[in-house]
Amino acid sequence: GESHSIGIPLAVATNDSFIVPTATMLVHPVRMNGTLLGAPQTYYQFNQMQDRIVSFISSHTKIEKDRLESLMLAKDTMAKDLGTILVGKNAVEEGLIAHVGDLQDAIESLEKKVEEKKEALKC
């Protein structure tokens, strides 16, 4: 598709994040359909877009900017594309996601945070 998948930025735009053990995350560079860049300005625009995405993701996670770019541009993971596929705990190990867990784990975490906030407001 055009530009960039929104999945990772959405997943990390939180205070806490979970991924189920079998879920995958595709870390890839900004791209468009086709293989041509028609003008230098297009290349520059794509670099700017990618830099904004990388900055957003790295500022909302524990992954370093250089490591994220390395995963995005990996050539050895997929036969006909650039990028890296991370499965469950690999996303946590890389620092993109905070925890491996399911919906129940996320709900329990949220309930705990609500209780902590209530207690803090009582003081």
Model-derived regions, located:
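N-terminal organellar transit peptides
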Residues: G1-C123
